[in-house]
Regions:
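Secondary-structure boundary/capping micro-motif
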Residues: 1-305
Length: 305
């Protein structure tokens, strides 16, 4: 079984989420500011956990001049972050998640020089939240802030969904809803592969999170293990198809709904997802009624979704 955020200390500390990119602030030389942001993936614990069980996530930020944007500078920044984490009592990360495809090669070179594994993945929800806070509250208050409006960058073309491999196809699947109050107890559930997410405090406990459950008596564990390697991100309904988005830009066709069901199902899922603050889930079990999950992932909408 691979390690997951459900047991972050199994092979080391929590994963780190990394963004190395330009910001909407002009420096004195007239060029855009660059900076690296690093935060650890939050450890999700049960409601009864103490502060020792769920420490504050590690954060690191460092500015970079535009003429030193390279893997050497980034390697040194990673080394500085590792030392700071050690001093503050954090374990070294198991992996670095990088969500910008355009910076993947540079992050990879810098990380490999320090023996760190890089995982291209959009499961950088904590980092995206932090970046959103900075774009909303920090950068606009700084000298040199580039106030809009700007032309929006071209949106990357979405990949054509790949068919779900037959070897990991389950017996059946169904839609499901989980009350937030129940989901808060997820750290105490019996879960094999998977990853949880912190639940926003502003959501009422009676709100329900939509998702799907995959069932397979013979292949549940294999399906869950395969999904773990995909880095599931979110579910989408598109032209009557149920799509799982995963990794950096992967898309998988889970099912094609009958035409007379697709529109209503898509509307119901979108409405429930919005009411749950964008949260969703994907579960893998041997059979309905089982209390153990071979796989369980909390998913979430992204800013582009």
């Amino acid at each position: 079984m691979i390690a997951s955020p459900l047991a972050p200390a199994a092979l080391g500390g929590a994963d780190w989420e990394v963004d190395f990119y330009s910001r909407p602030v002009l420096e004195a030389d007239g060029r855009k500011r660059w900076e690296v942001l690093i935060c650890s993936t939050p450890v999700v614990c049960s409601p009864e956990a103490t502060e020792t069980d769920s420490p504050e996530p590690f954060r690191f930020e460092k500015r970079c001049s535009a003429d030193t944007v390279n893997s050497q500078w980034l390697r040194d920044a990673f080394a500085e972050a590792l030392e700071l984490a050690r001093v503050e009592g954090y374990l070294s990360p198991r992996r670095l998640r990088c969500w910008r495809g355009s910076m993947r090669a540079m992050v990879q070179r810098a990380a490999e020089a320090l023996g760190l594994e890089v995982l291209p993945s959009r499961r950088c929800f904590a980092l995206l939240d932090w970046l959103g806070e900075r774009e909303r509250d920090l950068y606009p208050a700084q000298e040199g802030y580039m106030a809009g409006p700007f032309a929006l960058p071209p949106q990357p073309q979405r990949a054509v969904p790949l068919p779900w491999p037959e070897v990991v196809r389950g017996d059946r699947w169904n839609w499901a809803m989980l009350p937030l109050g129940d989901l808060l107890e997820a750290p105490d559930w019996g879960i094999g592969f998977g990853a949880l997410l912190p639940i926003p405090h502003h959501l009422p406990p009676q709100a329900c999170v939509p998702g799907i459950r995959l069932f397979s008596r013979q292949r549940a564990l294999a399906i869950a293990g395969w999904l773990a390697g995909l880095e599931p991100v979110r579910l989408e309904m598109e032209q009557g198809q149920l799509i799982l988005e995963a990794g950096l830009d992967d898309r998988w066709r889970l099912a094609t709904l009958p035409e007379n069901e697709a529109a209503a199902a898509g509307e119901a899922f979108a409405r429930a997802r919005a009411e749950a603050g964008g949260l969703q889930f994907l579960a893998v079990q041997i059979a309905d009624g089982e209390s153990h999950f071979e796989g369980f992932w909390m998913l979430r909408d992204l800013p582009d979704g």
